[in-house]
């Protein structure tokens, strides 16, 4: 049974984050921002204009500094004095969907609806790079742990890209539509699992494990795909059906076990997976990939793809039939999941779920 935090929002909650001290911050529709005590009481609130707050993220080096996105703006706040933004940037071309601050707090990445990613040098307070390669909405961007100049992005163009801040082009790209075409042989299995076969694999979210080399993607086809980064490329490790509708959220938990993965979906379900069982059990290289052959219909000139693309083998995914991971925890939340986070609340690791109701739901994680 979930514990509900109420009284902070009258509109749908869109995003959550918690700092190392367990302070929780939530952002909602119509510009409403709220901080919460461990008792579930609103501590302070701020209205950041009329635009929805789409992302909140604490600095990894200063637990009092909070980065938020609302509309085309980025506000930097001091949560000790939540009266107004300490600084505000308006550098993006369209509504911002996602922010990511690297571990050293030297750079901030902001992905928007135009498909662009703005890289802000936080020391000089200016844009140092603009990354333009997504042809549709860039839904998520995230810096890799232990690698402050490397980041991943994904979008509704069904592309996942690996970037290095020293370059303006992605160093590696995977097209999920091509990946899905190779997975069509799994159709019978997917029907049995209740997946929506006709949903395109629009990529909603990525999360990187603490090692910095393993990451997960959640997509509109309900699947969760696990990749491993080796050097300047990444390859498919495993893919499985996580939700009967789109997988909107994936988050690696910051626990002693590095591969606990939390997922949330448009089916109203929240699940916890141990994806390390597969990664550690195999103890082998990722499934081999080969560069995709250039054809008239898919040449870089036609598609604007100037980076390497790979044609991922579906072999790993076919093994789902016998190796589909079982959820360690499955929660019927009952509403489409807008956001997932985790925090230590009253000494217990806890899942926090945001949805359209304006409440924050808490589910305890036990025996992990």
Question: Which residues make up each language-model segment?
Answer:
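Short C-terminal beta-strands that terminate individual repeats in beta-propeller domains
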Residues: 3-8, 43-49, 86-91, 128-133, ...
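Canonical WD40 repeat/beta-propeller blade segments in eukaryotic WD-repeat proteins
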Residues: 10-17, 51-58, 89, 93-101, ...
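Loop/turn segments within WD40 beta-propeller blades
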Residues: 16-22, 56-63, 99-106, 111, ...
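Conserved strand-to-loop turn within each blade of WD40 beta-propeller repeats
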Residues: 27-30, 68-72, 104, 110-114, ...
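WD40-repeat beta-propellers
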Residues: 33-37, 74-78, 117-121, 160-165, ...
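Conserved blade-ending motifs and adjacent loop-strand segments that build the rim/top face
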Residues: 237-251, 288-344
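Blade-level signature of beta-propeller repeat domains, shared across WD40, Kelch, NHL, RCC1
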Residues: 339-368
């Amino acid at each position: 049974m979930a514990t509900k935090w109420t009284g902070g929002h009258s509109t749908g909650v869109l995003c959550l984050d918690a700092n190392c001290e367990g302070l929780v911050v939530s952002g909602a529709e119509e510009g409403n921002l709220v901080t919460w005590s461990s008792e579930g009481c609103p501590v302070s609130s701020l209205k950041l204009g009329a635009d929805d707050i789409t992302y909140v993220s604490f600095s990894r080096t200063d637990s009092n500094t909070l980065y938020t996105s609302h509309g085309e703006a980025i506000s930097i706040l001091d949560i000790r004095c939540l009266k107004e933004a300490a600084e505000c940037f308006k550098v993006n071309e369209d509504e911002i969907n996602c922010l990511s601050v690297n571990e050293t707090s030297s750079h901030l990445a902001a992905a928007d609806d135009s498909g662009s990613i703005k890289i802000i040098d936080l020391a000089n307070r200016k844009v140092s790079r603009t990354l333009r390669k997504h042809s549709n909405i860039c839904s998520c961007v995230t810096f890799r742990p232990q690698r402050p100049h490397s980041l991943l992005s994904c979008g509704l163009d069904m592309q996942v890209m690996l970037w290095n801040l020293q370059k303006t082009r992605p160093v590696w790209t995977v097209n999920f539509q091509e990946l899905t075409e190779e997975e069509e042989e799994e159709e019978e299995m997917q029907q049995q699992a209740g997946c929506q076969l006709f949903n395109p694999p629009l990529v909603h979210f990525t999360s990187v494990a603490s090692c910095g080399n393993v990451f997960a993607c959640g997509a509109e086809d309900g699947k969760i795909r696990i990749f491993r980064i080796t050097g300047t490329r990444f390859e498919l490790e495993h893919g499985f059906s996580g939700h009967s509708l789109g997988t909107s959220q994936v988050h690696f938990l910051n626990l002693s076990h590095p591969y606990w993965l939390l997922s949330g979906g448009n089916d109203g379900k929240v699940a916890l997976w141990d994806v390390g069982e597969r990664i550690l059990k195999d103890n082998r290289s990722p499934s081999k990939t080969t560069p995709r052959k250039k054809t008239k219909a898919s040449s870089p000139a036609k598609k604007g793809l100037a980076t390497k693309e790979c044609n991922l083998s579906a072999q790993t995914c076919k093994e789902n039939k016998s190796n589909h991971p079982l959820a360690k925890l499955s929660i019927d939340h009952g509403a489409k999941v807008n956001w997932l986070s985790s925090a230590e609340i009253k000494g217990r690791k806890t899942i926090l779920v945001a949805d359209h109701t304006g409440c924050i739901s808490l589910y305890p994680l036990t025996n992990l």
